[in-house]
């Protein structure tokens, strides 16, 4: 059995809000849908999922999780920045996940990369600034992040 590819994620906090990617995903069959698989959705059909994630993605060969977080942040949002520190570790769809606070953020967030190209009626992406209440409403995923992000927002930690 091969090791699961880790995920690096960028935590960008500004003015009491965190940048998230709101998503709607629907596949034809639940067997084709990663959210059905990890959400234990029964049945043959995928009815669709509305949720939000932090900008991030898989760690490429020879890349660190921090490097992946910065690369994915730029690819998905056009923002650049620097890693301030590792905030948390966890899992995302059954693979290791590393969450980094990003500082010295430059630019205006704009949906880009695959998230902009793959926009469709069954695969929709939207960048949003979320406060603590929004995290629940948007369905932050993985759900364990909500508590961590809420504490970070309430502490006013935006890494400058």
Name each model-derived stretch.
Residues 8-9, 14, 60, 64-67, ...:
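Residue-level detector of intrinsically disordered, flexible termini
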Residues 57-82, 88-143:
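Unchanged
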Residues 33-35, 73, 96, 144, ...:
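A generic membrane alpha-helix/interface feature
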């Amino acid at each position: 059995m091969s090791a699961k590819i880790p995920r690096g994620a960028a935590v960008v906090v500004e003015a009491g809000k965190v940048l998230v990617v709101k998503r709607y995903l629907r596949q034809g069959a639940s067997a084709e849908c990663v959210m059905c698989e990890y959400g234990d959705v029964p049945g043959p059909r995928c009815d669709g999922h509305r949720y939000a994630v932090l900008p991030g993605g898989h760690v490429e060969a020879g890349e660190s999780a921090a490097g992946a977080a910065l690369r994915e942040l730029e690819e998905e949002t056009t923002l650049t920045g620097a890693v301030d520190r590792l905030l948390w570790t966890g899992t995302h769809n059954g693979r290791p996940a590393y969450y980094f606070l990003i500082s010295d953020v430059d630019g205006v967030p704009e949906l880009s990369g695959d998230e902009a190209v793959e926009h469709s009626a069954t695969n929709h992406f939207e960048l949003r600034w979320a406060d603590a209440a929004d995290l629940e409403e948007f369905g932050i995923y993985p759900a364990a992040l909500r508590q961590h992000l809420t504490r970070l927002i309430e502490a006013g930690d935006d890494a400058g």
